[in-house]
From Swiss-Prot:
It comes from Haemophilus influenzae (strain ATCC 51907 / DSM 11121 / KW20 / Rd). Keywords: Cell cycle, Cell division, Cell inner membrane, Cell membrane, Cell shape, Cell wall biogenesis/degradation, Magnesium, Membrane, Metal-binding, Peptidoglycan synthesis, Transferase, Transmembrane, Transmembrane helix. The chain crosses the membrane at residues 21-41, 73-93, 94-114, 132-152, 168-188, 199-219, 239-259, 263-283, 288-308, 338-358. The keyword Nucleotide-binding does not apply. The gene is mraY. This is Phospho-N-acetylmuramoyl-pentapeptide-transferase.
Length: 360
């Protein structure tokens, strides 16, 4: 939005030309989202307390979690608000990719909001019926994917980029829709499953979003895209602003979500952030890198799949409890140790993912 204002004001003062640079707007988007999150955080927490929007806890979970019951939840609304305002202020709103990102973010956020609200009103951990939850997640994902397919049909925007192989980039055609569906829905659920400890999901989210900001910048620059042997995607550079807004909002939320948490993001935050990371990975054609950099999310989701599958087939559990972060808690690891170690692993995976861009 401010890009358009700057284009007008530059006629009178050339300093406003700085806002046309993506790097300037990306940094301003990060700072804006961070400050908004820090500013509204206490107000949101107080309002959630007044409304008695408290966290419900599983009866079969670790005993240390019983003390978390009643902690304000649905704090993800402050994340979404911060990202939304910052993106609308600093992104070029003529770019269609920005609207796709915001559509998925708020679409999944709305689904998560309903899920959280039902848990609170019913005073248990049961939210939306699973089939309806997946139905609406699928609807949002497919609308976004078809939108993107229409924008980039038969261009580099629908090619598959495979790490380590610079000359293998097959045109996906209609399979682009199938792959993109699993990426968005899968990432949304994976981040949702990871959000079980104070700050566990939000830091990896910030790290992955920060890495995707760098990748989006390179993908949207003809020279860097050619140098790294990755597709040049016409509209992708503006996605940098959206990614840095996620980083800023995530760090601002972490201020209140760090152990012991003053607020939880709830499904309204985790589903939205997961869906956002998924759609960004599709936009910059780096679905495989999302698996690497978001390895913590992948392992958390796989632990649940393996646990459920093993119990149904063999009546035996692989882990003491799933997702896997609860397994380590039940082994005696203090919650902060689990969180920090998962953060370290996430940082390592993000750095590994960035390195693969050059190893081709």
């Amino acid at each position: 939005m401010l890009v358009w204002l700057a284009e007008y004001l530059v006629r009178y003062e050339t300093a406003f030309n700085a806002i046309s640079y993506i790097t300037v707007r990306a940094n301003l988007a990060l700072l804006t989202a961070l400050f908004i999150s820090l500013w509204i955080g206490p107000k949101v927490i107080k309002r959630l307390q007044i409304l008695k929007f408290g966290q419900e806890v599983r009866n079969d979970g670790p005993e240390s979690h019983f003390a978390k019951k009643g902690t304000p939840t649905m704090g993800g609304v402050m994340i979404l608000f911060s990202i939304g305002v910052s993106t609308l202020l600093w992104a070029n709103l003529a770019n269609p990719y920005i609207w796709v990102c915001l559509f998925v973010l708020f679409g999944y956020g709305a689904i998560g909001f309903v899920d959280d609200f039902r848990k609170i009103t019913r005073k248990n951990t049961d939210g939306l019926i699973a089939r309806w939850k997946y139905f609406w997640m699928s609807v949002v994902a497919l609308v976004a994917i078809l939108w993107l397919y229409w924008l980039g049909h038969d261009t580099d925007a629908t090619r598959l980029v495979i790490p380590f192989f610079k000359d293998i980039m097959p045109q996906l055609g209609l399979f682009y829709i199938v792959l993109s569906y699993f990426v968005i829905v899968g990432t949304g659920n994976a981040v949702n499953l990871t959000d079980g400890l104070d700050g566990l999901a939000i830091m990896p989210t910030a790290l992955v979003a920060g890495a995707f900001a760098l990748i989006a910048w390179a993908t949207g620059n003809v020279n860097f895209a050619e140098y790294l042997h990755i597709p040049y995607i016409k509209y992708s550079s503006e996605v940098v602003v959206f990614c840095t807004a996620i980083v800023g909002a995530s760090l601002g939320f972490l201020w209140f979500n760090t152990y012991p948490a003053q607020v939880f993001m709830g499904d309204v935050g985790s589903l939205a952030l997961g869906g956002a990371l998924g759609v960004v990975a599709i936009l910059v054609r780096q679905e495989f890198l999302l698996v690497i950099m978001g390895g913590v999310f992948v392992v958390e989701a796989l632990s649940v799949i393996l646990q459920v599958g093993s119990y149904k087939l063999r009546k035996q559990r692989i882990f003491r409890m799933a997702p896997i972060h609860h397994h380590f808690e039940l082994k005696g690891w203090p919650e902060p140790r689990v969180i920090i170690r998962f953060w370290i692993i996430s940082l390592m995976l993000v750095l590994m993912g960035l390195v693969t861009l050059k190893l081709r």
